[in-house]
Amino acid sequence: MRIFFILIFLAPLQIFSSEMSRVNIDYENQTRYFLIHEPKNLTAVKAVNLVIGIHGYTGTASGFEKETTGGFNESADEYGFIAAYPQGEFFYDRGFFYKSYVSAWNDLTGSRTKAPNDKGEICAADAPTYNKFSSCNGKDVGRCAWASCLDDVGFIKDIIIKIKNTHNIDKVYVVGMSNGGMMAHAFACKHPELVDGVLNVVGLPHLGLNCIPTKPVNYIVYAGFNDDIVPPINIVSWDKYYYEPMENVINEWKAAFNCKKLESNNSNLKYQIHEQEFSQCNDNVKLISLLNMEGGHTWPGIEDDDAGNCRSDEQSDISFPKCKSINNLWGNNYLLPKLFNL
């Protein structure tokens, strides 16, 4: 899930704001971190939900909150949940006159070149290749690999455990956009016992690499019909990388959980969204497929394709433009009730 690189220059350090706190974690001999926002009127007595929000390729933890979702902390206050935003591995791809910030997650598909069972490579022979992350040094990732090689599944698991040890948590949800959606998808497969629901926004896995959980987990996948970065139907992206069709992903999960009932609906908000909900599944699992017939590669309610390629004061050590204010008028209020009702 690669978007064109953003040209950036060194920015001065900023004073941290109090809206989010930055929490360091020592994981696999590295200091990694996440940002956390606690809702207003939080008490130790009442259990609250935890939502892990995962940024996309070239994104940041704060960019996911500020721009990608158009103010996710406001939704945390409205719905009363704790929001945590992990930061993925990043590096600066240096040119002669510039350097560009690159970040990604090891979603277990983008760090591989070939799919199993002789299904071929995840990109075309003439597809562009992308500079590899330092975590992939010494690993035979192949020419098509573009993502991090860190144990990001374990990192996110650590974040969930850490927050549950310090807060009174009721339910846990993992959501992500693009490469972050792929990461949420992978986490659902690896640790379904830790989450009550997963929301994957425009983050379909690479062709032939769709995973299926072995334990029950509720799942929502959202895609934009006109998305040419992670296409939900046409398989081939603009840069000639291959992605699993949305229908295949939901059908494989539906079969795995033996879902017997399907309800279809067309939701007409600002755009027409084709909704499918699968229920009467094993272990009361629910699966939801949402296809925005006019949407592209953005979070619902956001029009800017570059939203999230920024940082806030909490991440002033990252050389990236400051985030601007984006107001999401309908997307978060469309997705979150569906997620919390799984």
Annotate each language-model stretch with its function.
Residues 33-35, 49-54, 59, 81-87, ...:
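Structural recognition of the beta-strand scaffold that forms the well-ordered cores
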Residues 151-155, 160-162, 288-342:
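Extracellular low-complexity, Gly/Ser/Thr-rich intrinsically disordered linkers
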Residues 41-42, 57-59, 89-92, 96, ...:
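Acidic glycine-/aspartate-rich tracts in secreted/extracellular proteins
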Residues 27-35, 45-173, 186, 190, ...:
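Serine-hydrolase catalytic machinery in alpha/beta-hydrolase-like enzymes
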Residues 70, 77, 196-284, 291-296:
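The feature captures the conserved acid-bearing segment of alpha/beta-hydrolase catalytic domains
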Residues 3-13:
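Sec-dependent N-terminal signal peptides
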Residues 15-50, 62-82, 134, 148, ...:
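A domain-start/cap signature at the N-terminus of enzymes
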Residues 42-44, 57, 149, 162, ...:
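Functionally engaged cysteine thiol sites
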